[in-house]
A protein has these predicted regions:
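Low-complexity, Ser/Thr/Pro/Gly-enriched N-terminal "stalk/linker" regions
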Residues: 21-76, 83-102, 106-113, 158, ...
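Extended polysaccharide-engagement surfaces of secreted carbohydrate-active enzymes
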Residues: 270-274, 278, 284-534
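Well-ordered alpha-helical scaffold segments within catalytic/enzyme domains
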Residues: 22-31, 75-91, 129-149, 190-205, ...
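Sec/Tat signal peptide C-region and signal peptidase I cleavage site
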Residues: 15-20
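Solvent-exposed loop and edge beta-strand segments that line ligand/cofactor-binding
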Residues: 48-75, 111-129, 165-189, 225-255, ...
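Eukaryote-skewed repeat-based solenoidal scaffolds used as protein-protein interaction platforms
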Residues: 147-235, 249, 266, 273-280
Length: 534
């Protein structure tokens, strides 16, 4: 038995300062102006990368300076382009939108889908997100288009709807046919809104009936105690020994919950809307006082960027749609928009706080994805609500335990911390800490002191992640680790971990009994190595 004494920094208040929102007069128009100014900066920068007169296979596409290629989901930028064309009257945005959609023919398939990438991946489940962006562009701004262009875009939308209807293995919450497992839940959640909207546009009640069926099935995919939406991982039919199911905060707040909210409002599904609201409130507990989302524990946190996710859209529109009865949602949007502004350098949104300092270029996926989300929020009518400048994690509440993800949030003085023993795995192992770890430590003045990373960095979704040319890479999660013959053994991967929490005055004690194992739960050559940490 080895005893390792883990020095908790949570109560070491060596830095002064209080956690509170900035004392700034807030109004809906102020928020909209901030968001729109950021949107213009992003979109104008994107246009500097739009290809022109190079080759028919490139013209209209927007080249990513980090990945040296055109991302197949770049068509999502049609919404912000059409919004700015309508808002400003500047033809450059309309022309750019038409040229962009012309380039999208490179990833458009005969079955009505759009591929996620050109000749890199044939995955086409992301058709649902392309369809939502194109639907909203036509719904709000289709009057700007000539008849030929508008009719062509609408025909592609109709074909996309048919594709979603014919591919339950991508979008359904029911096992059918030759399906081996259900797809990640963000696809099912998003198809409800897409099919409901397209059903209305094309007078297709069969689309809307399928949306209703999927939405009804999704009601069974919220956890019992905390109402987390689960399904971001393959093992969904029974919980782990600690009662956990696969949850990813990033995909939930930036795609699934917003699109479910849009669907519930459009279909007037009050039962589902009540569930979604409760889930949104639970997820809001994880927003840090600076507007960041704490996804240090999620199953797909390998795409966590601090302010959100690498290729997910953004939470603003869905939360704004319900802000008339939840004014704290307005404050959450305001703080996140300001964090996005701070994370924008040379007109592009960077995927991490230290990317610029590390010399890592910004992938444009983050920019066009969140430009789409900002636009979705700006398309909505202004809400009338009394501002609430307090978010849940502003309060010095001590500790909150979220049973369904076996995670504790600690709030003492200016410190915020996350301690997790969340043991639901993704389809790829080693994506997040499991064996009892402080996955985030944050201070009001210093910001994040440390934050969890993948246990071992690999390109799980290579087309959607960035490689790193540094010579030495290691996990950023505090841990006990041993390397033997090139294999890493640590507590982060241990699925057989016991955690006990106690409190003494202002001290939060976590006693952990764990083991050193590799990502396949194998022990070192000499056998099991138990570890005790306090």
């Amino acid at each position: 038995m080895r005893n390792v004494f883990f020095v908790a920094l949570l109560y070491v208040l060596s830095l002064s300062g209080q956690v509170r929102a900035e004392n700034i007069v807030f109004s809906d128009s102020d928020l909209r102006n901030e968001a729109e100014n950021l949107l213009v900066e992003w979109v104008d920068t994107l246009l500097t990368y739009q290809c022109a007169e190079l080759n028919p296979a490139l013209d209209g596409g927007i080249l990513c300076p980090a990945c040296a290629r055109i991302h197949g989901r770049i068509g999502d930028a049609v919404l912000p382009l059409m919004y700015l064309a309508d808002k400003t009257g500047n033809d450059k945005y309309l022309i750019a939108a038409k040229r962009l959609m012309a380039w999208m023919e490179n990833v458009h398939r005969p079955d009505g889908s759009w591929m996620n990438d050109v000749h890199v991946s044939d995955w086409s489940g992301t058709t649902v997100f392309a369809a939502i962006a194109l639907y909203e562009a036509l719904h709000y701004h289709g009057h700007l288009l000539d008849d030929s262009t508008r009719n062509h875009w609408k025909q592609q939308l109709l074909e996309a709807g048919e594709f979603m209807m014919k591919n339950p293995q991508m979008y359904s919450r029911r096992m059918q046919g030759k399906m081996k497992r259900l797809n990640n839940v963000n696809y099912s959640a998003s198809v409800t809104y897409a099919l409901q909207a397209l059903g209305g546009m094309f007078n297709r009640p069969d689309f809307q009936e399928e949306a209703r069926i999927v939405a009804s099935d999704l009601k069974n995919f919220f956890t019992e105690n905390d109402c987390f939406l689960y399904g971001e991982g393959p093992k969904i039919w029974s919980p782990t020994k600690n009662g956990c199911l696969p949850v990813d905060l990033g995909y939930n707040i930036e795609e699934s919950l917003p699109n479910l909210a849009y669907y519930a409002l459009m279909a007037d599904n009050q039962e589902l809307l009540a569930i979604v609201e409760r889930s949104m409130n639970t997820h809001l507990e994880f927003m840090l006082p600076d507007g960041a989302w704490d996804n240090s524990w999620g199953t797909r946190s390998f795409k966590w960027t601090y302010w959100g996710g690498r290729t997910s859209d953004g939470f603003m529109g869905g939360y704004y749609a319900l802000a008339d009865r939840h004014p704290e949602y307005l404050e959450a949007i305001r703080r996140n928009v300001r964090l996005l502004r701070k994370s924008t350098v040379d007109g592009l949104l960077h995927a991490g706080r230290d990317y610029r300092a590390s010399g890592i270029p910004a992938c444009i996926h983050h920019t066009f994805g969140h430009a789409k989300a900002l636009t979705a929020f700006l398309e909505l009518p202004s809400v009338k609500a009394t501002p609430n400048k307090t978010l849940p994690r502003d309060a010095e509440y001590g500790v909150k335990f979220f049973r369904d993800i076996r995670t504790w949030l600690v709030a003492e003085g200016p410190w915020r911390a996350t301690f997790t023993g969340y043991d639901a795995e993704y389809k790829v192992k080693g994506t997040h800490p499991m064996g009892g770890a402080v996955s985030l430590l944050w201070h009001a003045q210093a910001g994040p002191v440390f934050a969890a990373t993948m246990n071992q960095y690999t390109l799980i979704e290579a087309p959607n992640m960035q490689s790193n040319s540094r010579k030495y890479l290691m996990s950023g999660t505090p841990r006990v680790e041993m390397v033997q013959y090139g294999t890493i053994y640590s507590n982060l991967d241990d699925l057989d971990t016991d955690i006990t929490y106690t409190k003494e005055k202002d001290t939060h004690n976590f006693h952990v009994n764990t083991h050193l194992v590799d990502i396949d739960q194998q022990t070192p050559i000499q056998g099991s190595i138990p570890v005790s940490m306090d």
